[in-house]
């Protein structure tokens, strides 16, 4: 019921025609049953903001955190995409990395990312730190969540993120396997083939007022839940 022909997405890149590809797919996948298979249903997030600790005897703690995100077809998705880049989606150039890693030395890496699922979208992040410092790292993340929701981003941050996202995009297409993976992802998300031509324009079209309005709507500090695995010191479940 999960693996059915009507639910397949196939992309082929290289010196091959549809006529040549068809028989190969028939041989490889022809025995799969017909039909649409199981469909996901919308999920209501039952978990509330707070902290869950999973005890594990390790020298450092790893935390995953997040709350509800945004649909891929939402009009504000690209504003959310740029916002996440500024918050924690650009490695050491992000706000969280500047505050948690560079200024305080609490971690080697902290990041955030948009998780796009058909019926369960999330804005998530992760960080790892020593058991006696993970509490401080979490406090800084929460503070930056509140700060960005309240104050938004600057014009310079927006421009820098747009330049990075649009400039790095062509580098994803440097091999057949990568291109095929991108095309399958586009199919799964219901995007047209023209998306590749319009994606950068839509990123550059995000305005400061739009992204700051969205920051206040999307970022919900009170809903942020942390799951910490390790033996963190000074933290209690909420």
Task: Enumerate the language-model features and the residues they cover.
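Short amphipathic alpha-helices in soluble, non-transmembrane regions
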Residues: 22-28, 137-144, 238
């Amino acid at each position: 019921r999960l693996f059915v022909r009507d639910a397949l997405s196939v992309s082929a890149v290289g010196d091959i025609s549809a006529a040549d590809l068809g028989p190969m797919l028939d041989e490889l996948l022809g025995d799969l049953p017909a039909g649409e298979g199981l469909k996901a249903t919308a999920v209501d997030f039952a978990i509330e903001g707070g902290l869950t600790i999973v005890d594990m005897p390790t020298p450092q703690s790893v935390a995953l955190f997040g709350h509800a995100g945004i649909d891929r077809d939402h009009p504000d998705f690209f504003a959310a995409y740029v916002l996440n880049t500024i918050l924690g989606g650009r490695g050491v150039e992000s706000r969280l990395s500047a505050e948690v890693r560079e200024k305080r030395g609490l971690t080697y890496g902290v990041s955030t990312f948009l998780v796009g699922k058909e019926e369960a979208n999330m804005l998530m992040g992760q960080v790892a730190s020593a058991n006696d410092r993970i509490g401080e790292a979490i406090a800084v993340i929460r503070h930056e969540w509140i700060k960005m929701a309240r104050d938004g981003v600057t014009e310079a941050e927006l421009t820098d993120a747009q330049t990075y996202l649009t400039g790095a995009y062509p580098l994803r297409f440097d091999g057949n396997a990568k291109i095929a993976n991108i095309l399958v992802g586009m199919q799964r998300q219901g995007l047209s083939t023209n998306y590749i031509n319009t994606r950068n324009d839509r990123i550059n079209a995000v305005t400061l007022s739009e992204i700051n309005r969205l920051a206040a709507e999307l970022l919900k500090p009170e809903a942020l839940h942390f799951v910490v695995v390790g033996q963190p010191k000074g933290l209690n479940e909420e």
